[in-house]
UniProtKB/Swiss-Prot annotation:
Listed InterPro entries: G-protein_beta_WD-40_rep, Tscrpt_rep_Tup1_N, WD40/YVTN_repeat-like_dom_sf, WD40_repeat_CS, WD40_repeat_dom_sf, WD40_rpt
Subcellular localization(s) per the UniProt record: Nucleus
Protein name as catalogued: General transcriptional corepressor tupA
Skewed-composition ranges (Low complexity): 109-128, 157-198, 207-224
Gene Ontology cellular component list: nucleus
Protein species of origin: Dictyostelium discoideum (Social amoeba)
PROSITE patterns per UniProt: WD_REPEATS_1, WD_REPEATS_2, WD_REPEATS_REGION
Family indicated by similarity: Belongs to the WD repeat TUP1 family.
Keyword Metal-binding found: no
Pfam name, any one: WD40
Length: 579
């Protein structure tokens, strides 16, 4: 018995020793773990510091690059202005008409130069000089177009404006004088919906013709107009008659109130024609096609509409009767992928999803604190992303009826209102443009912030993914478009191309279904077609009397492509293009 007790005691002692050894080992491991974690945190902090330093250096380098590029552009503009002044003096002479005889010497006229200078000052607050732009032509009425590349800049003449040739310099001068006449006749610009608390002075929905800041220069222009020589009076009378014809709603002929200009330095088969003119009761803030291309949705004050693309007839109208006082502009409309629902975002800070067939509200999403400016559906129809003036973008889960993610915080989120949002074709990414000049990218499935794209000099008002999802286009108040490369590593944002050519704010951008065209709408009242592969503009369309606030292309191309424009002139227009 005694031996057994001793044996048990010995075993217990051995077990206790092993437990003590294990505890000692465990404490060593814990100590090593703490040491490793401390080292890891220190290295992570150092890495973050290095990354932040690199980011600051890159941002500083980009700012210096932008500054130097701007200085170079200013010097180029000074040189171009000398050529422009010479060509403008030639514009005021009889040599602007076709003639087989030698042109007479140009007659210099100080009054005409004053008109040009005053108009340039009114239309360009930053003293930017006019760039050389493609030569405009009148839309064809059935005959094939024959565009020639020539060093002299000659182009074909179309019926509608008489014997006078049009190039962009003449067209710009004509437009400036037409705008003066319209302002004199109207007495004040078109009132656009208020966008407080965003920067209302610069928002596209308030892009009317502001008279207060230009009254003195307008008076100077009026005095100069009264002193023009006989030839200018004849040309001005022709323009008045042309403006009168353009303002009449009845008896319009194809091409009587819209112009197309083609770039003489490139060969293109691009042709444009007007399909339907869709009159509205207020500013058209947004346009959007259904996925099958059969319907177009528009948003204006207090209502959203759906039109049949083939006939141009209104087939549905959606009005929220709960809000009956004051204005309620529909800032954004978007079809669900199956075409059964229409999402709308408005000044009431809510996202509404309408059943198109019953015209009833299916869902209402609350959560934004300010006006909603942009919406987009995911490709599977399960989510909607919205952008608001509250500096946030939100992803809404339609099935669960709640917000899945809020994109944006004090550290990496927008510093000002979100003006535009877009979902990538595969539904994995969300892009947002903001008034702080930056485009941001998030993971739509996790809500994690991925990247920021800097380079614009002013607020970003529109973003759009390319059909293959490898590029992102942005349009800005700095009058430019940028194309960002998403195909490689996102550790460094890379601007693939910058598109310059608009003379005022770029308010909307969109890709064609095959990605071969990038189109943009601007406050300068024009739509431009760009080749995203080389940054070349092929065509400029002038088909509205006020800012082109929204552009959209039909996802389906049959015999020809279709695109839509929405404008401050109370009209949306459907166009077809062949390329």
């Amino acid at each position: 018995m005694y031996g057994r007790t001793a044996r048990a005691s010995e075993l217990l002692d051995n077990l206790k020793g092993e437990i003590d050894a294990l505890n000692h080992e465990l404490s060593l491991y814990k100590h090593q773990k703490d040491d490793y974690e401390r080292k890891f945190q220190n290295q992570l902090a150092e890495l973050n510091t290095i990354q932040q330093t690199l980011y600051d250096l890159e941002r500083g380098q980009n700012k210096m690059k932008i500054h130097y590029e701007e200085e170079i552009r200013q010097l180029k503009r000074q040189l171009e202005q000398q050529n422009i002044n010479a060509s403008q003096r030639d514009l005021n002479s009889p040599s602007t008409f076709r003639s087989n005889s030698p042109a007479p010497p140009a007659q210099h006229n100080n009054n005409n130069n004053n008109i040009i200078n005053n108009n340039n000052n009114n239309n360009n607050n930053n003293n930017n000089m006019q760039r050389n732009t493609p030569t405009p032509t009148i839309p064809d009425k059935g005959q094939p177009k024959q565009r020639q590349r020539s060093g002299s800049g000659e182009f074909y003449q179309q019926p509608g404006l008489g014997p006078q040739q049009l190039n962009f310099q003449q067209l710009n001068l004509q437009q400036q004088q037409q705008q003066l006449q319209q302002q004199q006749q109207q007495g004040s610009g078109q009132s656009f919906p208020s966008l407080s608390p965003l920067d209302s002075n610069r928002h596209p929905k308030e892009m009317g013709n502001n008279m207060s800041g230009n009254s003195m220069s307008m008076n100077n222009n009026n005095n100069n107009l009264n002193k023009k020589p006989d030839m200018e009076e004849v040309k001005e009378e022709d323009r008045r008659r042309h403006d009168t014809e353009m303002s009449e709603e009845n008896g319009k002929e194809k091409g009587t109130d819209w112009l197309v200009g083609y770039n003489p330095s490139v060969q293109t088969n691009l042709n444009i024609d007007l399909l339907h003119n869709l009159q509205h009761n207020s500013v058209v803030c947004c346009v959007n096609f259904s996925n099958d291309g059969k319907y177009l949705a528009t948003g204006c004050n207090r209502s959203a509409q759906i039109y049949d693309v083939d006939t141009g007839k209104k087939v549905h109208a959606f009005v929220d009767e709960s809000e009956k006082d004051g204005d309620l502009y529909i800032r954004s409309v978007c079809f669900s992928p199956d075409g059964n629902y229409l999402a709308t975002g408005a000044e009431d800070k809510t996202v509404k999803v309408w059943d198109i067939h019953t015209k009833k509200i299916q869902h209402t999403f609350y959560g934004h604190e300010l006006d909603i400016y942009s919406l987009d559906y995911s490709s599977d129809g399960r989510f909607i992303v919205s952008g608001s003036g509250d500096k946030k973008a939100k992803i809404w889960d339609i099935e669960k009826g709640k917000c899945a993610f809020t994109l944006g915080n004090e550290e990496v989120g927008p510093k000002n209102g979100v003006t535009s949002v877009a979902m990538s074709p595969d539904g994995r990414l969300v892009a947002a443009g903001s008034l702080d000049n930056i485009v941001r990218l998030w993971d739509a499935q996790t809500g994690y912030f991925l990247e920021r794209y800097e380079g614009h000099l002013d607020s970003v008002y529109s973003v759009a993914f390319s059909p293959d999802g490898k590029s992102l286009a942005s349009g800005s108040l700095d009058k430019s478009l940028k194309l960002w490369d998403l195909s490689g590593s996102r550790s460094r944002s890379r601007c693939r191309a910058t598109f310059n050519g608009h003379k005022d704010f770029v308010l909307s951008v969109a890709f064609s279904p095959d990605g071969s065209w990038l189109i943009s709408g601007s406050k300068d009242r024009s739509v431009q077609f760009w080749d995203p592969r080389n940054g070349t503009t092929h065509m400029m369309l002038q088909g509205h009397k006020n800012s082109v606030i929204s552009v959209a292309l039909s996802p389906k191309n049959n015999s020809h492509g279709v695109f839509a424009t929405g404008s401050g002139d109370f009209r949306s227009r459907l166009w077809k293009y062949d390329s």
